[in-house]
Structure formats: structure tokens, C-alpha cells
Regions:
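Canonical P-loop GTPase G-domain recognition
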Residues: 111-139, 334-407
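Conserved Switch II/interswitch segment of TRAFAC-class P-loop GTPases
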Residues: 70-75, 296-300, 309-326, 336-337, ...
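Extreme N-terminal, non-catalytic leader segments
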Residues: 131-196
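Cofactor-cradling patches in redox/metallo enzymes
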Residues: 21, 28-133
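C-terminal end of P-loop GTPase domains and the immediately downstream helical coupling element
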Residues: 148-152, 363-471, 476, 488
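Intrinsic disorder/low-complexity segments
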Residues: 469-500
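Nucleotide-state-sensitive switch-loop elements of NTP-binding domains
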Residues: 172-195, 206, 211, 215-302, ...
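Catalytic alpha/beta active-site cores
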Residues: 72-74, 102, 528, 532-834
Length: 834
């Protein structure tokens, strides 16, 4: 049965987000879509949002409710802290809703709702109510008036109290009659206001929000004491009345006490601005912000509404506007003070820049101005410190001073560089993966053709065998030893009436064999030798100039000899060649079964997985799970605080997640404690680091922990303990010395704990330390996950831009190559997360 959609009686606004250090955004994305379709204006923040950021947003946006998902633990502290912070800031009317699947226990749900959380939805609620039913309940509880009364907020606007500013805007938007008197007072106050308004408009998807964020970041740096207000407008849905106010998800610089942002829905069709924009601007002027930015929703070619509300207007577009004649239809090119061609990394950007400049020149009759001096700029807002954005920012500030007499004289320094995408993968190599797949398909096609040739040769061979008076082994020897057919030798065994026939077959064999690659003929001729290698009791091969001998068979409980590598019993050359070209034995091309002929013996592939609490607790767990086993295969899970590259803290929304579902590691000493008692340079020890975003940093901790372990061994072997202790006592003269908390677990000999708080280069001669370092990093075994593409697509712990993160991956691998790090892998592809 279809559940009826609840229709709210008031204009309901809700903030949606996923909790701090939580990348599970699939659920909240589904929920906010249903909330929006229920007629609600949704301010969506995305994933990994702190309590302070959510609360600041809720107050600035004057919302009815906050809706959160939390799947990463720490929910008790997170929700309670949010409730307390809202209460502390006088916003306890904002209701809090949450969910986390089975992560939040029924007892915890009761505890949180008793504390004051409006509702935590459980899987049982989902089964009972359905998705729409849950959203109906949420919206119904949030359906109350905002701004129906004012209590003197207008008198304190100049204090820039976000709650007061937001309430006056809400009153003007929701109850114009209630706000009428307050707005009259504001208009009188603003008669002499010199606060400039920068209007930013453009087509949908042009990157306006990212561009605004970059302008704000530069403004805050350029003017350390000035403030900025932002009004961002998004369209309302005509069908439902709901709206997605999603500009904040692109804003990284606005969580600052000097920035106020308010998102507005148009609440009308076919217009890019809300009819209450003027009132919102007046409120921000009364609050005495130094600059106001007004960003519209996406506009069409004929929309110029922005110029009525702004002192300076900026039109944002992309290079993909179609034919140059389309520019003649864009009204904003007649009125805009500045034009930004964003996403300037797109193909054809330079041509677009030229065409837009020409059109701008024609529209404004600027025939005497050189094209380079026209206010048209190429920008890449998504790229950090983009030169085009720097130039645009300076031009905007200069225009505000010129047109609005604003006290915003910029000291921002710019270069004459043009925006140019800094590519991790050069454009000429963007088809790299396609080329690999094309090459693989071409290889498969070639292999199949070669298989057909080999099979035809085998058919000719069997035909000759059937008419000769020789055994198959004699004929085969004749074929293979002579690398072809020895006609004279074979014809000795042929009756006179068959000689011409055999000559024809031999000639055909030689002709067909011309189409067979010599390498493939060698594969066929060596097949018998390959089979014998795996029949012999011992298989010998070399790895890095070291000869390794492996038993080819293992003995079963029934005392049967079971081959470790079983070869197919093919006879036909086509079958043999196809198997060798597409599968083959381990250690041979195409390496489908690994790089080496056999796996290392004496090291069972047991995964000793651990990660909980602090480093000492997980260290004890590692020693417990590896006790009595010759090989130590330590696999490390990190908590969400570490996964997002943050330090642990007493702040409740962080504190609740420390050591939850993984170990908390934030410094080198933590890594030393975590792996203490395990010789990380031992050939029987390997470590897996399940970390991605901050992988290079955690890898650095691990490598330095391993190096300092070997420094400790060197110190003890050379009797340098007293000398080193004296140096460390001097270093820690006026501070507490770090230590391993609690007693050492069984099996932990304390290796790695001597140099807590220092590194080997502080207590050993430089040449000794560098020698130990070089040897250690070449010996350590293991892997770090560092699969950034998977994070970008699924897990959401890519804490840097994807391009920068990929560059880091490349830099790490380059270091490994240059320093002979061959036993530790710099990346482990784990696409199963996707």
C-alpha cells in the first residue's frame, strides 16, 4: 500500500548531514531526497560534518530541524553534544532526528530520546512505517512556524548574532506583516549604508558555489578583520514546493566567525531569485557586514534580475556554451561588470575566452580597449590557488572600490599567469586505461589466431603420423629436434605411393608454420620439459639472485603425493598454446597465478586482524592473535578519527569515536607502541595498514617506527645504552617522557619502546642512522591500502583533492623505487568497497 505524503502547513526547513568522520552518505542522500519531495526546503551539508558546523548552519539558516545519520559509532556523544550546543546557543527549539541502522542499539535510542533528541529511527521503524512513513513523522514533528514573532532582534543586528539575523530574515520571508515594522527600522538604518553587494549569477552547473567559496577564502585572507555575508538562492520545485539548498556542500571556507550564510529558496517558478532577497540584503546591511555576496540559482539566457540587487555583477559561465552565436542571446553579457569562464580546464577554453571577449566588446562598444584588458577571466575554481581565480578576485575587489566606493582596497598579489589545469595524468595520457584494455583485447585476438595456427599444425602432424611406419615418439623427435620437418629423414619411412602426399603435407606444414610466432613454437616444443619440471620432486628458481628450492608435491593424510601445481593433460598443440598464452603456470607470462613459481613456504596466509582503543590495547591484541606462530601477519584497522586524518580530542563529537572500530594512531610514538615487540624488519613479519586518506602520513609513522626499532637493536648490540640514555635525559629535561601505558603483554620483549619521544637520528651518528634507515626500508614487508580512487567513488575518506591524493600516491611509489623498497607495497586495490 502506498503511503500518503504528508503536506506541511508551514514552510519547513531542515539541515541534513552525515556525522563527523562518517563517509556513509548513501542513506542520508536517500532521506533528504524524500524529505525534499515532501515539500521541505533541505539544506544539505554532505558527510563528515562536526557538531559545531551543523549547529552553526542550523542557526544561520533558522531551520526547524536537523536530520543526521551516524554509522561510524560515537553517536551517543555526538547527538548529546549537539543537543547541548543548541541549548547553549538559545536554539533548543530546533529538533534533532537521527538514524544509524543497526549501529545504534535500542537501549541507546531510548537513552538519546530521554535526553531530548526528538527521535532516533531504527530498522524496526523502517519496517513498520516505511521510508515515507518515517519522513512523514519527521516532517510532521518539524511542522511549526518560524519567524511568526520578533522580540527585539532588530535592535541587536549590528552585533552580528547569527540567531537574530536569521530570525529577522525568516520573519520577512514567512510573515511579512510581522516583519513590516522591523524592516522599516532597518531601511532607515541603512540609508547611509555603504556595504557593497556583489551579485553572482550564471547558468546551472557553472560552478558558482565553488567560485563563491574561493572568493570568500581569498577575502578572509586579504582582510583579516572584515566580515562577509552570503545570500545563496536555489530554485523551489514547482510540483512539491520543496527545494534542495545545496550550496553549502561546496563551501569549505565559510565555517568562520566572520562569515554568515543564508540559503533561500525561490518559492516561485521560473525566477532565479526569491522575492525576499531585497529584505535579506537589507538585514545583512543593518548587521554591518563589510561585503555581501548574492548568488542566484541557475539562470537562462534572458535573465538579468541580479543587477537590480547588486552594485557589481559577476556572470559565471563555462566554455561549453555551444556556437559563438549563442553568446549574442545572453543578456548578462550586456550588463555584467565581470565575466568568469569557469571550468577553464575543459577542451576549447581558449577559444571560448576569445569568443566571449569579442562578444563582450561588441555588446559594450569597447572598441578602444585591448582584449587582454577586458573583464573576462578564465578560472578553475576547483583547483587550489588557481591563478585565474586570483586574478578574478583582485578584479572583483577593484571593481567594488571603483563602482561602490567600498572600503575594500585589496593588497592581494597576483601573477600574469592564465588558469591552467595542473594535471596528474597529462591529457595525452587520459586514455591510458583504455589503451591497456585495447591492448588486452588485441592480445586475446592475436592469441586466438595463433591457437588456430597451432591447431592446424597439430592436425598436419597427426596426419603425417598416421601414414608413416614410425612411432609417434620418433616422429615427434624428428619434428621437434629439427625445429620443423626433416624431409629426408621422414621420407625414409614412407612407401613410394605415399611420398608425394607426405611431401605435400610437409610443404603445407612449413607454409602454415610461417604464421606461427617463434616464441609460441618454442612454448609448444618446451611443453614436455615444463611438465617434467613439475614432476620432479624439487623445483629450483631464482629471486633477486638467490636460488630457492621448493618441493613440488605435498603428502596427504593417505600418504599420496599431491602436486602443488597441476598441469592440464593437453596433447593438441592448440590447446597447449591457448592455456600457456591465457593462463600458464605461476611465475610465467601472463602471470595469472602470480609472479613467482611457488608461494613462500613456512608462512601461512593467516590475517591477524586487530584495531581497537589505543595503541597499547591493539598491541596486546596483536600479541594474543600471533602467539606461538612463526609468521606475524599483522593487519591493522584504524578508527574513523585516524581515517580522516584528525587528532583525538576531548570534544564530545570526536571523543566518542576514538578507538571505535579501529585503533587510534596520531603520532610516531603511537605507531611505536602499536608494533612494539614485533621486529618489523624480520622476514617473517609483515604489516597491512588499512588506511587511505592520510595513508602517506601513517606510512611515514610505520617506516620510522621500523627504522627506530633497528636503531634500538644497534644500540643494544654495541653497548650504547648509557650514552643514548644521557642524550634522552637531556632532551626530556623539562618535560614528561612518553611511555607504554600498562604492562607489556606476553610475548612483547619491549622492542621499539626505547626511543619513545625521539628518533634514531637524534641519538646516533648521522652515517650510522642513514645506513640503518637504508637497510630497514628495503627489508620491511607489508602493504598500505592507499586506494584513493575507491575512496573518491565509495568510502569518502579522500581528505585531499583527488588530484593531490593521486600525486601523493605517485610520490610515495617514486620514493620506493629510488630507495629500493621492494617488499612493501605502496597501494592495495580494494574495489570490493564499491
Amino acid at each position: 500500500m502506498q503511503i500518503a505524503v504528508y503536506k506541511p502547513k508551514h514552510k519547513v526547513r531542515i539541515v541534513t548531514a552525515a556525522a563527523l568522520f562518517d563517509g556513509h552518505d548513501a542513506s542520508i542522500n536517500i532521506m533528504r531526497r524524500i524529505i525534499q519531495s515532501t515539500g521541505v526546503e533541505v539544506i544539505h551539508l554532505g558527510h563528515d560534518r562536526s557538531v559545531e558546523e551543523v549547529v552553526n548552519t542550523a542557526i544561520q539558516e533558522d531551520v526547524n530541524a536537523i536530520c543526521l545519520t551516524s554509522y561510524q559509532g560515537g553517536h551517543n556523544e555526538y547527538f548529546k553534544y549537539m543537543y547541548d550546543l543548541l541549548k547553549e546557543r538559545g536554539a533548543s527549539h530546533i529538533k534533532i532526528f537521527g538514524g544509524g541502522g543497526g549501529v545504534i542499539l535500542p537501549s541507546e535510542i531510548k537513552e538519546l530520546m530521554d535526553y531530548g533528541i526528538a527521535r532516533i529511527y531504527s530498522p524496526d521503524d523502517g519496517r513498520e512505517l516505511g521510508l515515507q512513513g518515517m519522513i512523514n513523522d519527521l516532517v510532521k514533528q518539524s511542522d511549526f512556524a518560524i519567524g511568526d514573532t520578533l522580540n527585539g532582534e532588530v535592535k541587536t543586528l549590528q552585533n552580528k548574532n547569527a540567531k537574530d539575523i536569521a530570525r529577522v530574515i525568516s520573519s520577512a520571508e514567512n510573515f511579512p506583516e510581522v516583519a513590516k515594522e522591523a524592516l522599516e527600522i532597518i531601511h532607515k538604518k541603512n540609508k547611509n549604508s555603504k556595504t557593497p553587494v556583489l551579485g553572482i549569477t550564471g547558468t546551472g552547473g557553472a560552478g558558482k558555489s565553488s567560485l563563491v567559496d574561493e572568493l570568500v577564502r581569498r577575502f578572509l585572507t586579504d582582510f583579516p578583520k572584515k566580515t562577509i555575508g552570503i545570500i545563496s538562492v536555489d530554485p523551489s520545485k514547482r510540483k512539491t514546493g520543496g527545494a534542495l539548498l545545496g550550496d553549502r556542500i561546496r563551501m569549505n571556507a565559510i565555517n568562520n566567525s566572520r562569515v554568515y550564510m543564508r540559503s533561500l529558496a525561490t518559492r516561485q517558478s521560473n525566477l532565479a531569485l526569491s522575492k525576499y532577497v531585497h529584505e535579506a540584503i537589507q538585514v545583512l546591511k543593518a548587521a554591518q557586514y563589510d561585503l555581501i555576496i548574492l548568488e542566484t540559482s541557475g539562470i537562462g539566457q534572458s535573465d538579468t534580475e541580479i543587477i537590480e540587487h547588486s552594485d557589481v555583477s559577476l556572470y559565471v559561465m563555462t566554455p561549453e556554451f555551444g556556437a559563438a552565436t549563442q553568446l549574442e542571446k545572453i543578456d548578462m553579457l550586456d550588463f555584467a561588470d565581470l565575466v568568469a569562464i569557469n571550468k577553464f580546464d575543459k577542451r576549447g577554453s581558449l577559444d571560448a575566452l576569445r569568443d566571449v571577449k569579442k562578444q563582450y566588446m561588441r555588446n559594450n562598444n569597447l572598441w578602444d580597449i585591448h582584449q587582454d584588458d577586458l573583464p573576462v577571466y578564465g578560472t578553475i575554481a576547483s583547483q587550489f590557488n588557481d591563478p585565474g581565480m586570483n586574478t578574478l578576485y583582485k578584479a572583483v575587489m577593484d571593481k567594488l572600490v571603483e563602482k561602490a566606493s567600498a572600503d575594500l582596497k585589496s593588497t592581494f598579489t597576483i601573477s600574469n599567469e592564465m588558469s591552467e589545469k595542473i594535471f596528474v595524468i597529462p591529457p595525452s595520457r587520459t586514455r591510458y586505461l583504455s589503451e591497456i584494455s585495447e591492448n588486452n583485447r588485441a592480445y586475446d585476438k592475436s592469441a586466438n589466431l595463433q591457437v588456430e595456427v597451432a591447431q592446424k599444425l597439430y592436425g598436419i602432424y597427426k596426419t603425417i603420423e598416421s601414414v608413416l611406419n614410425v612411432t609417434a615418439s620418433e616422429l615427434k623427435q624428428s619434428f621437434l629436434d629439427t625445429y620443423g620437418l626433416n624431409s629426408d629423414e621422414i621420407l625414409k619411412h614412407v612407401q613410394d605411393d605415399n611420398k608425394n602426399f607426405i611431401k605435400l603435407l610437409i610443404a603445407e606444414f612449413d607454409r602454415v608454420k610461417l604464421n606461427l610466432d617463434p616464441y609460441n613454437w618454442e612454448v609448444i616444443t618446451n611443453w614436455g620439459e615444463t611438465v617434467n619440471k613439475y614432476k620432479n620432486p624439487i623445483y629450483s628458481f631464482k629471486v633477486r639472485d638467490q636460488e630457492i628450492k621448493i618441493e613440488t608435491h605435498s603428502e596427504s593424510l593417505s600418504h599420496l603425493q599431491i602436486p602443488k601445481v597441476a598441469l592440464p593433460k593437453y596433447q593438441a598443440w592448440g590447446d597447449i598454446l591457448k592455456w600457456c598464452l591465457q593462463e600458464n603456470v605461476p611465475g610465467e607470462f601472463p602471470f595469472t597465478s602470480g609472479l613467482y613459481p611457488f608461494k613462500r613456504t613456512g608462512e601461512d596466509p593467516a590475517r591477524m586482524f586487530a584495531g581497537e582503543g589505543g595503541p597499547e590495547r591493539t598491541n596486546r591484541r596483536f600479541h594474543y592473535v600471533s602467539a606461538g606462530l612463526p609468521a606475524k601477519r599483522l593487519s591493522t584497522a584504524f578508527d574513523s578519527v585516524t581515517l580522516y586524518g584528525n587528532d583525538p580530542d576531548l570534544r564530545p563529537d570526536i571523543y566518542g569515536k576514538i578507538g571505535n572500530a579501529g585503533v587510534s594512531i596520531c603520532c610516531l610514538d603511537d605507531a611505536k607502541k602499536l608494533y612494539s615487540g614485533f621486529n618489523l624488519a624480520d622476514v617473517m613479519t609483515s604489516v597491512s595498514l588499512t588506511i587511505n586518506g592520510p595513508a602517506p602520513m601513517l606510512l611515514g609513522f610505520f617506516m620510522n617506527a621500523a627504522i627506530d626499532q633497528q636503531c634500538e637493536i644497534y644500540i643494544k648490540e654495541n653497548g650504547l645504552e648509557k650514552e643514548v640514555e644521557a642524550k634522552m635525559a637531556k632532551i626530556f629535561k623539562d618535560q614528561e617522557r612518553p611511555k607504554y601505558n600498562g604492562g607489556l603483554p606476553q610475548g612483547n620483549n619491549g622492542l621499539g619502546l626505547m626511543l619513545l619521544g625521539v628518533t634514531g637520528d637524534q641519538v646516533l651518528p648521522v652515517d650510522v642512522y642513514l645506513d640503518i634507515k637504508t637497510k630497514t626500508i628495503a627489508q620491511v614487508r607489508g602493504t598500505v591500502q592507499a586506494d584513493i580512487l575507491k575512496e573518491d567513488q565509495a568510502q569518502n575518506t579522500c581528505i585531499f583533492s583527488t588530484e593531490f591524493a593521486l600525486r601523493l600516491m605517485g610520490d610515495v611509489q617514486e620514493y620506493f623505487i629510488n630507495n629500493n623498497v621492494r617488499n612493501f607495497y605502496s597501494v592495495s586495490i580494494s574495489g570490493y568497497h564499491i
